[in-house]
């Protein structure tokens, strides 16, 4: 039997990294008896080691809690634990769409941060009831009144009735549960209407196939029902219905307003796309739910094994990861310098780092990552054999003939940065250096909120690291894409001994090409070992060399065996050596060690 709508509450928790979101979720589970003391572990909802270590949530998780409130009624509380990071913004928007309210968790010592804001605004767009929870009130540095003022000034939410809590110490947990019941509205829905359910998330389970997280809007989901995904157009037979408490629990059915999971013998996560609408195959709904969009990769980079024999292992590992992450795309590529590998697409830099870290950690692979690049749009003029067309460029090495390119467009983002006043100057300079356009600057209680428009290309490298180091870790940063704009961009190639090295080519702005090229050449000069002949290292745009360094040759003393005698004998030996070196320079291969590549790519943006 499904729970009456009036006794269901669906809510998510919005918080910046490290503000105590997962700990609060743990305490709510513990208080309502979802797990016994023995089963309780820190960060129950974060399954991956990386999630626990970095203190971030990557995949959305859901827990159904049963809570008997002070009014004597027993309520079904569905907690959606959502990712907090900008790379997973679309997953967050779908998770929020499945709820009617949200707990806004703010650290009593840190105050409101940029990422919190982005998710709060999304929550407000979904007409959510937002309950502020000020966490970590037992810290010595906690300043509750200041944080209340920030919530009111920055977000515009009344904070006088905010719940004061310390998830770690277990303070304010019951008050939080009572606030959820009293302030978050129950869902609306009709059990008799045709089935409409939103696909909130999906992941691969080796025993059950793809497990699909759904929020039922209208109708009822039952075992043995034939369902249809409206966007993908595929039909499936449900073989299991249930919920997480957080243990997997099988149910007979899931009704309107409820959140649960279904499995249907699906083998590929790509078929179960986040945001799709699930309906009955025999009596389908009239229209899918709004807001669905295809997730497009934003950042691309090449992944190569350091040992060529690991290529098959890398292929298998990437395919396994893809089972759980449909937003991650890959295709095979080969490079003269690095051998065989894959060109992979990611939602953003954190996504790239996580995939890379999971490959090295879970699959024990040693990887080289080429410089990340973004998606450029090229307008090509017509030729004798081809009409004019627009193409997307994911890999700088595939850049067509510059004479055919009429215009290159690059993606831009709008970034919101929060920073304490004393670090404002250096941060503004950093944004200016990255071709940023300042849009707004406001002050809120000792902190500045800066809005900048920046090219994504300039942010992709190490913008976030530089931002953190300049502000000693106090700045927080959030961004969203605002479309493509034309730019004066050129492809910079690196030539070692007059041979282009494809893995090091990159697309740069013409204004910064020279300094980037010079930096790269200087670095390679330090990294490549000396050979028996001299090696030129050049950075070039088209046919024009913009920077050059030369690695001097090692010298072998060929005249050492001559004692006295005629000077022409020595001359002859030196001439012969000169000839040999000339021939070596023409035919000799320069051995670029793997470490040189890794260091050059890692340092890709200091030039």
UniProtKB/Swiss-Prot annotation:
EC identifiers of the protein: 3.6.5.n1
Membrane-topology annotation of the record: Peripheral membrane protein
The protein's enzyme class: hydrolase
Keyword field: Cell inner membrane, Cell membrane, GTP-binding, Hydrolase, Membrane, Nucleotide-binding, Protein biosynthesis
UniProt keyword annotation of rRNA-binding present: no
Family: Belongs to the TRAFAC class translation factor GTPase superfamily. Classic translation factor GTPase family. LepA subfamily.
HAMAP family the record matches: LepA
Name of the featured protein: Elongation factor 4
Biological source species: Sphingopyxis alaskensis (strain DSM 13593 / LMG 18877 / RB2256)
Gene (name only): lepA
């Amino acid at each position: 039997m499904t729970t009456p709508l009036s006794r269901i509450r669906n809510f998510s928790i919005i918080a910046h990294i490290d503000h105590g979101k997962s700990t609060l979720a743990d305490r709510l589970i513990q208080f309502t008896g979802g797990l016994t003391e023995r089963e309780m572990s820190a960060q129950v909802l974060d399954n991956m080691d990386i999630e626990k270590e970095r203190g971030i949530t990557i995949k959305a998780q859901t827990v159904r809690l049963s809570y008997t409130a002070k009014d004597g009624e027993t309520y079904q509380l569905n907690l959606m634990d959502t990712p907090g990071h900008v790379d997973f913004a679309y997953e967050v928007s779908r998770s929020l769409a499945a709820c009617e309210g949200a707990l806004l968790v703010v650290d009593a010592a840190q105050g409101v941060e940029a990422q919190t804001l982005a998710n709060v605004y999304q929550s407000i767009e979904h007409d959510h009831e937002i309950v502020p929870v000020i966490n970590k009130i037992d810290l010595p540095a906690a300043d509750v009144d200041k944080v209340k003022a920030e919530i009111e000034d920055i977000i515009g939410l009344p904070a006088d009735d905010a719940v004061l809590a310390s998830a770690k110490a277990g303070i304010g947990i019951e008050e939080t549960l009572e606030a959820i019941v009293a302030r978050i509205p129950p869902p609306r829905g009709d059990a008799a209407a045709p089935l409409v359910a939103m696909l909130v998330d999906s992941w691969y389970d080796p025993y059950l196939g793809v497990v699909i997280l759904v929020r039922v809007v209208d109708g009822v989901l039952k075992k043995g029902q034939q369902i249809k995904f409206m966007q993908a157009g595929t039909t499936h037979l449900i073989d299991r219905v249930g919920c997480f408490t957080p243990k997997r629990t099988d149910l007979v059915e899931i009704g309107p307003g409820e959140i649960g999971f279904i499995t249907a013998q699906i083998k590929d996560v790509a078929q179960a796309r986040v945001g799709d609408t699930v309906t009955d195959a025999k009596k389908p709904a009239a229209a899918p739910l709004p807001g669905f969009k295809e997730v497009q990769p934003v950042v691309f980079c090449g992944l190569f094994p350091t040992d060529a024999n690991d290529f098959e292992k890398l292929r298998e590992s990437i395919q396994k990861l893809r089972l759980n992450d449909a937003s991650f795309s890959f295709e095979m590529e080969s490079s003269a310098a690095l051998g065989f590998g894959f060109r992979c697409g990611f939602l953003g830099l954190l996504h790239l780092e996580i995939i890379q870290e999971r490959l090295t950690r879970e699959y024990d692979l040693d990887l080289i990552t080429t410089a990340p690049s973004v998606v450029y749009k090229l307008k090509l003029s017509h030729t004798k054999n081809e009409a004019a067309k627009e193409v997307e460029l994911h890999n700088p090495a595939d850049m067509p003939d510059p004479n055919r390119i009429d215009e290159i467009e690059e993606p831009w983002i709008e970034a919101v940065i929060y920073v304490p006043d004393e670090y404002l100057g250096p941060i503004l300079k950093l944004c200016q250096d990255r071709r940023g356009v300042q849009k707004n600057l406001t002050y809120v209680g000792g902190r500045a909120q800066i809005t900048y428009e920046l090219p994504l290309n300039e942010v992709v490298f190490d913008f976030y690291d530089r931002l953190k180091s300049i502000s000693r870790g106090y700045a927080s940063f959030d961004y969203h894409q605002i479309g493509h704009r034309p730019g004066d961009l050129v492809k910079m190639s690196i030539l070692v001994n007059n041979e282009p090295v494809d893995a090091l080519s990159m697309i740069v702005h013409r204004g910064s090409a020279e300094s980037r090229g010079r930096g790269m050449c200087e670095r390679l000069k330090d990294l490549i070992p000396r050979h028996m002949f001299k090696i030129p290292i050049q950075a070039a745009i088209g046919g024009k060399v913009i920077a050059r360094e030369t690695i001097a040759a090692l010298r072998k003393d060929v005249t050492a065996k001559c004692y006295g005698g005629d000077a022409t004998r020595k001359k002859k030996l030196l001439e012969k050596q000169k000839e040999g070196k000339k021939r070596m320079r023409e035919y000799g291969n320069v051995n670029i060690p793997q470490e040189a590549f890794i260091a050059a790519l890692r340092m890709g943006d200091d030039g």
